[in-house]
Amino acid sequence: MRAIACAVSVAVVLFIFIVSPYIPTTDCIHMGKMQSMDSSGLRASSDGRIDPTQVFLNIPSTDRLRKYLEYYSSGAHVAGINRTQAEYTDAFFKAHGIDSKIVEYFPWMNYPVDQRVTLFNESTQEIKFAASLKEDVIPGDPLSEDPNNLPAFHGYSADGNVTGQLVYANYGTVDDFEALRKAGISVEGKVVLVRYGYVFRGIKVQAAEMHGARGILIYSDPADDGYGKGAAYPDGPWRAESSIQRGSVMRLQVYPGDPLTPGYASTEDAPRIDPKDAKNINHIPSIPLSYRDAEPLLRSLEGSGKLASDLGSSWVGGLTQRGVEYWTGPSELSVNILNKVEYKKTAIQNVIGRIKGSEDSEHAVIIGNHRDAWCAGASDPSSGSAALMELAYAFGELMKFGWRPRRTIILASWDAEEYGLVGSTEWVEDKIDWLRTNAIAYINVDSAVSGSSFHVESSPVFRKLLHEVTKLVTYPYSKESVYDAWLRESHANASSGDKGEDDDGSGGDSDGDEDDDKGDGSDSKTSKPKKDKPLMRPLGSGSDYTAFMAHAGVSSVSIGFGGSTGAYHSNYDSPKRLTTFIDPEMKLHQAMVRIWGLLTIKLADDPVIGLSPVSYAKEIRRYIRQLEKTSARHLNATAADRLPNKRAGAIVAGKLRHLRSAQRQLLISAHLVEHDRQHLRAIYGEDCQMKSRRRHASCLKLRDSINDRVFGMERHFIDPEGIPGREWFKHILVSPGRWLGYGSQIFPALAEAIEDGDWRRFQALAKSNVETIYEAAWFLREV
């Protein structure tokens, strides 16, 4: 790893001068014209403040974005390795008028030393196959041959050398292991081979460990993101046969961040728990494989155990096109996994920029993207890093014209996201008291561009603002608005039954019904999405919004253009692939900067914060319907040890009624906030500009009250006790699913009590959740 660190030698100051100069694009020419309008080109509102919206939309440059993308994709930038990029980011912020500093933490992380996978005859010790664990060099793509590329490796994987017969376990979900058990196939003492998809990879390792496996291999099947989807790289965007998906295998659903400092920041002198006591770490070795390396292993299973198709059609992957038959095993031959890794306390660097608010500097809108990557990481995360840099540039230009946001804007470039959201989690744990008092919202962009479809995961409170902003930005490849493209594609995906990888849909999609309800909280006849509203997914985990939303109770949203995951976490997630097949003209990147920037400006600069408690309250009604479906699905299948099933059903029905009553009160309170907002506009005006000091003071008091209630609502869904068994997660409405990892679970504590058949626990938690919702309702009524 020293070689990797030494190889990273970018001249920070020189690069700033290369990337940052004003490039004469049409956007910039427009900016030049604007300087002659009212000396700045910026309109002033009735209170004399500058309105930056239209000027901002003309700033983002595709040329600059391309340069940023090339820089952030270059050189090794695994977490804790590339301090140079942190220093560049810090210097860039400062060069554009943004106060900035590097904030270090010291988590416990692992790095690869030696990885091997062999198939052999245990009696004769004859090796039948040795996995290459290498990715091919692609002519014309220089980053595919970078000697510093990371080996096939899992972050937070266990050090170990294990041998066992091979068993194929499909996607490695808990249901898949249960299907093997029912079929009479044991994984005890075996090495398990599973496919990527449906659930987070760390859960696959955990499930294998729970069932007694000695080790696990995770491969990318071509049916999921390879030639089964289309032409493979370099002929198309989908996964090449030698492509390897790296990634973390932390138990992310238990708690993210540094394993040895759960719930508090990993400062250099912070106390650490013993690694053996870390609950978010698995204990069996794991290694990722390409489907080229997986093919001989699957062939070794043919004729052993059960035909995989006997367990379900979903058990059969895309290698059938190469003549492979999918069998469960166990194999006659043995598999050896050597995963030698080094764990150590490692310095990581977050870069935190700050634009101080002109009127309300204590309250802040936070925007963030992670900087670290397993490989080049052009889409994940460098497309987002490029967007963040262009936002910093744009804000700097606006400040040259005299603009300052009403509230503070914090720009965060996170480190160590790939290992388990480490950089952002440590910062949130470090700043938790300040965040719970002063943070208005967190806006996350991870992969800004990995495809062409606009995707949103969000707290429902953002719905109306997202609609407003996306209607202002043109979708580059059809000339409709991003909102219209989002609406069209989200409903096309819904009608085709499309489900994203690592999500079983348990969180569902938001149906966007904020405009068709009378406020009575009654259930609609259908949960199908409305035709005139785009879909939003609830937040689970898998990116840097997690600690903000699920731990601190800060309303969060994550946005990006997605669709193709065919190079995810591989050497082929390169600028060459991204600009050949996904965004040749960098216009999707430009659109993302515009959306991200407008969301930030509106939240930081509008007199009244544009978050919608009404949208949230209505969405909770749908959450309750989802919980009702969960209970119906599990009630008869789960043995109720403490109470008869009939009694359990009555308990659930009663608590659901109480939840609905609380939701109705919340909705009434949310409408009162909206009434106050309308009253402010009608009587005073949002700018509160009037000659009478008394009326001015009354206006400011009402406006501050509205804003405090609007952004404070999310905090009231935080339960200090957390979810039983994974107490770090404290949001009562959404969290990553216990057996999903990425995907969201609605009313997680209640859903897990139902799944466990623990009806007494369910009663206690439901009572607490009902009280929490009532408390949120009363908070919204405070003036």
PLM regions and their residue ranges:
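Noncatalytic luminal/extracellular "stalk/propeptide" segments of secretory-pathway proteins
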Residues: 32-55, 67-188, 222, 237-256
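Second-shell loop/turn segments in exported
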Residues: 51-59, 73-82, 152-157, 191-198, ...
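Structural recognition of the beta-strand scaffold that forms the well-ordered cores
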Residues: 68-71, 102, 166-168, 191-195, ...
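Extracellular/luminal Protease-associated
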Residues: 139-278, 285, 376, 380, ...
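Soluble metallo-hydrolase cores and metallopeptidase-like ectodomains found primarily
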Residues: 148-179, 256-378, 393, 397-401, ...
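Metal-dependent peptidase/peptidase-like ectodomains
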Residues: 245-305, 360, 416-574, 579, ...
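Alpha-helical metal-binding/catalytic segments enriched in His/Glu/Asp
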Residues: 351, 367-421, 426, 596
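C-terminal amphipathic alpha-helical interaction region
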Residues: 699, 703-783
